[in-house]
Each structure stands twice: as C-alpha cells, then as structure tokens.
C-alpha cells in the first residue's frame, strides 16, 4: 500500500513538473555564439556571504548565502526592485506573505509590499515597514522626487523612499483604439530623456505617459517580444544613456530573451539566452540551483547601465510550496558586468565603402583601457557578426587623455543604415570578458514616434478623419500618410511637422461607404518614399 501511495505521489510530482517545463529547442546557430554574445554571460559571481545549516529548501539550494537579497524563515518573498537614496542606502520594495499561510505559495494574491533597507546593494536587506497590500511591485521615482510603487491593478505613491504614509491610486490607460494584449498586469517602466515614462505590459504592448502618472497611451498593436513560440511574462525594461533594454521570460520553457531598442517601440533581439536556471553561482563555481527564476529587476548605475539583477526564486514547483514545509521563496541579488562606455568617432555614416572605424573606449574608476584591454581580442560591428566572433578587427590604437581609441578595419562590420548601437566583445589582459555598445554620432537617439488612432467616418465632410500624434522626443520629419480601408487605398496626404506630443487630424476624402464599424483599417507612414510605420485596426 505504501509503495502504491509512493508511485501515485511520484506520478503527480512528475506531472506537475512537466506542466511547468517545456524544453525549447534552441536555434542551431546559437551553438556558435562566443562568450559575451548572450546577456547571460554578464552575470558575475555572487558576493561571498553567510552559509548556515538547518535552513529551508531542497538540497540544491542549501548552499545558498542566506544574507544575499532578502530572506526570512517565516516569510515567502517574491518580486521587487531596489532604489538608492541620496545618502547611499539601498531600498528594496518587495512583496511577500507568511510562509505558514493556508495556501502556501498560492497565497501570493494576498501578499504585502515590504520596504527593506541595506547599506549594501546585494543585501542583506532588512524590513523597515510595509507599503500596503499588493503583488509584483516595481518602484520608480518621478521627476519631482516622489516615489511610485506599482502593484498589480494599482500603485502607491509617497514623497520619498522613507515615507511612512503611502497613498493608493490607480493608473488610467488609453488603448487608443488598439486591442490590449493579454491585459494590464506585471507592468515595467523606464524613464525617457524628457522624464516621461515608457511602460511595457505583460503582453508586450508599449505605452507612454508624459510624467509617469498621467494616462498611459498605447502605441503598439502587437507584442514587441521575439517572434518565437513562448509563454511570455515578467518583462523588465530599462534605459541607459544609449538605448533601451528589455528582457522577457518564457516561463514554460524557462528561457528568457534579451532585446534592445533606440526608441522603446522598435526592437532587435540578440541571439542567446538572457538567463536560465543556474545563473546564481559563487566565486568557487558552486551553483544555487533554484527551480524558478522570475520577476527580474535591474539596479542601474549613474550611466543607466544594469549592474545588478534581482530575481524572485523558489526551490520547487509553486504548487508544492505548502504551509510549514521545507520549501519557500526569496529575492536574490546577482551582480552584472556593466560593460564599457564606447563611442564611434566617425562623423560620417558607416557604409560598405567606409575603410576604418574609430571607437573610443572611455576610462572609468577601476578601469584603464590603455593598460587593461587585450586589444587583439576585440571585435566590433553589428551584433549579428560580433556575437559569432566575426566583425571588424583592430589595426592600431591611439591615446586620448585617459581614454583609448581603437582603429578597426571596417571590412566585415555588418553595420547597416538601421544600426543604432554597434557592439564590441573582447577580453582584458586577465582573460575577463569585455563588452559594450557604441554611440553613433549620426544617429538620432530621441526620434519622433508617429502613431495614429483608428480612422473615423465623418458624415458631414464625407470622409475619414485620422488623428495622429507624435509620442517621440523630436520633431517629426517630412511624412506622408496613407489610409487603407478593407484593402483599398485612400491616397496619401502630407503631414505637417509635429512637435513632441503634438496632435494633428487629417481628412481623407472618400466616395466609399466607410461608416462600417467592422471595417479594417491600416494607417501607413512614409518618409522619402519608404514605409517607416504601419498601424492596424
């Protein structure tokens, strides 16, 4: 009888595991990626910490540092992120619930957002107070210094990270006649150059708010995630001085993807895994083998580079984490290789006829490119080349103050007119990985973002009215707009130059019956005769 019970229990466990794991086949080309190609290569060993006996967890995580991130025997922690105050202290806003809750991990919907503080970025973080009820928080600071802590279905706001009183509110969302992709949960935010905010929702839609609190306006009509099979969730977006970054997790396949963007709307996906189980490792090579790594969040340096990633981790299947058992969850901190600061010095656009490319590697505290870089190891160009060990090779170097200028032979760069941040991969003289993305002097990193609403039939004027708004940070370039209704073009009309956030309405004369609410529309934008954007309704 005991044997039968064991077999039934084992069968249930394996079925539960299979229900949460699907082996995703990697593209064959990923086998040829070099070190530095994958975002996953940026994870560094966790700082040395305290290891003790008699703690919760499966055997695979008993070697963990209990003082890393936040961990308490009686609390199951989950997602959260860290802000730093002007005194240098680190503030983690993280959700959690009593470990002995009747539903175990499934009590997550009743979680509380805690405010924890530490003098060290990696922790240990100690709870100082609670903010309120809520799950999967993400904290960000507004231009006026107030702090917003987003939670599913709402947010809390206070004057600062140390505030004792937090006020609850709800964001307003304007889908702008677009379908909301998979609802509005697990939102993630990035501050733009003008202190407005870009938001990505769980479904992969992109939204913009002028100040982080005003209505979020949807720009996209489809997800911006990689066009591959996956059960995507847990996006995290951030912006550094050069570009936007986005990581999204396929929770079923337990693989995450890394993307980059110049404007936060149009993305490229780099090859290789952003992270997989096992990225939490120690200096001696020992690995904390957590079953799941979810809710990634980044801490950024003064240049906006990600220097640490925090994860919600659990040692078993969520449904197997029961009250008063040996399983639980916590939030861990893993340092990241932040990358080099690079800039291309060629003033003219790089083309197939370009002979050499000059790249400046900036000196920083603790990094002297003139003495630390193994110049011969460097490769530079499009990520499509460099990630596979190809790209430009260095031919000589020059000194510029404390910085180093590396001159590359341009052949094989792979750089096209669409390139906005070419990549460098190499090693330092100790064999450690070096990488970075370079600013191009001829690229506009604050581009216009023209976006239309659904065309409306105007009975009085007998045509189509189309509202267009510039959500970008620069004035729009000369543009023509074409409306296609049920597959038939309604001709092109010139659009005047729109300043950031400016709205213009265009009227398209038509002798067709266009008042059908079920009609399908496309609004297409052309610049210099080339299609640059298409909105579908």
Predicted regions and their residues:
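Terminal connector regions
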Residues: 511-537
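Edge beta-strands of extracellular beta-sandwich domains
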Residues: 433-441, 530-537
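Sec-dependent N-terminal signal peptides
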Residues: 4-13
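Short, surface-exposed loop/turn segments at beta-strand-coil junctions that are enriched for proline
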Residues: 411-416, 511-515
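Carbohydrate-active catalytic/glycan-binding domains of CAZyme proteins
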Residues: 20-343
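Intrinsically disordered, low-complexity Pro/Gly/Ser/Thr-rich segments with frequent PxxP/GP/PP motifs
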Residues: 488-516, 525
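Asparagine-centered strand-capping/turn motif at beta-strand->loop junctions
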Residues: 468-473
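Boundary/junction segments of secreted and surface-exposed precursor proteins
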Residues: 339-359, 447-454
């Amino acid at each position: 009888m005991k044997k039968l019970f064991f077999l039934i229990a084992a069968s249930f466990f394996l079925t539960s595991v299979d229900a949460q794991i699907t082996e995703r086949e990697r593209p064959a080309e990923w086998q040829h990626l070099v070190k530095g190609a994958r975002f996953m290569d940026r994870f560094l060993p966790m700082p040395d910490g305290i290891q003790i006996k008699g703690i919760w967890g499966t055997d695979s995580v008993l070697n963990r540092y209990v003082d890393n991130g936040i961990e308490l025997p009686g609390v199951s922690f989950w997602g959260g992120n860290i802000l730093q105050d002007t005194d240098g202290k680190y503030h983690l806003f993280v959700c959690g619930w009593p470990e002995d809750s009747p539903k175990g991990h499934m009590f997550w919907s009743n979680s509380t957002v805690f405010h924890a503080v530490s003098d060290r970025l990696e922790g240990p973080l100690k709870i100082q107070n609670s903010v309120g009820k809520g799950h999967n928080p993400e904290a960000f600071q507004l231009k006026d210094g107030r702090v917003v802590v987003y939670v599913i279905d709402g947010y809390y706001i206070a004057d600062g990270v140390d505030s004792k009183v937090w006020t609850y509110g709800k964001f307003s969302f304007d889908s702008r006649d677009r379908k909301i992709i998979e609802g509005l949960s697990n939102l993630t935010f990035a501050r733009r150059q003008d202190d407005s905010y870009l938001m990505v929702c769980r479904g992969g839609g992109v939204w913009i708010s002028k100040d982080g609190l005003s209505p979020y306006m949807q720009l996209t009509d489809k997800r911006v995630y990689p066009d591959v099979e996956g059960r995507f969730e847990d996006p995290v977006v951030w912006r550094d001085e050069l570009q936007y970054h986005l990581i999204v997790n396929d929770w079923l396949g337990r693989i995450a993807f890394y993307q980059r963007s110049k404007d936060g709307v149009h993305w490229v996906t780099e090859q290789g895994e952003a992270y997989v189980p096992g990225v939490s490792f120690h200096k001696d090579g020992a690995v904390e083998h957590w079953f799941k790594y979810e809710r990634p969040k980044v801490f950024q340096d003064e240049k906006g580079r990600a220097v640490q990633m925090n994860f919600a981790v659990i040692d078993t299947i969520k449904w197997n984490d029961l009250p008063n058992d040996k399983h639980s969850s916590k939030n861990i901190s893993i340092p990241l290789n932040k990358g080099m600061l690079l800039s291309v010095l060629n003033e003219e656009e790089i083309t197939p006829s370009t002979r050499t490319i000059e790249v400046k590697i900036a000196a920083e505290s603790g990094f002297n490119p003139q003495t630390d870089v193994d110049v011969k190891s460097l490769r530079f160009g499009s990520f499509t080349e460099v990630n596979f060990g190809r790209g430009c090779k260095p031919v000589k170097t020059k000194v510029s103050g404390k910085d180093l200028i590396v001159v590359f032979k341009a052949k094989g760069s792979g750089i096209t007119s669409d390139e906005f941040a070419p990549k460098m991969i190499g090693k330092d003289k100790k064999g450690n990985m070096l990488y970075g993305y370079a600013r191009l002097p001829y690229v506009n990193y604050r581009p216009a973002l023209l976006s239309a609403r659904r065309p409306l039939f105007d009975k009085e004027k007998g045509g189509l009215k189309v509202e267009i708004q510039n959500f970008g940070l620069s004035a729009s370039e000369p543009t023509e707009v074409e409306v296609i209704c049920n597959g038939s073009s309604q001709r092109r009309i010139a659009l005047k130059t729109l300043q950031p956030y400016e709205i213009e309405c265009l009227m398209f004369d038509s002798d067709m019956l266009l008042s059908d609410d079920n009609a399908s529309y496309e609004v297409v934008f052309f610049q210099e005769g080339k299609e640059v954007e298409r909105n579908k309704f």
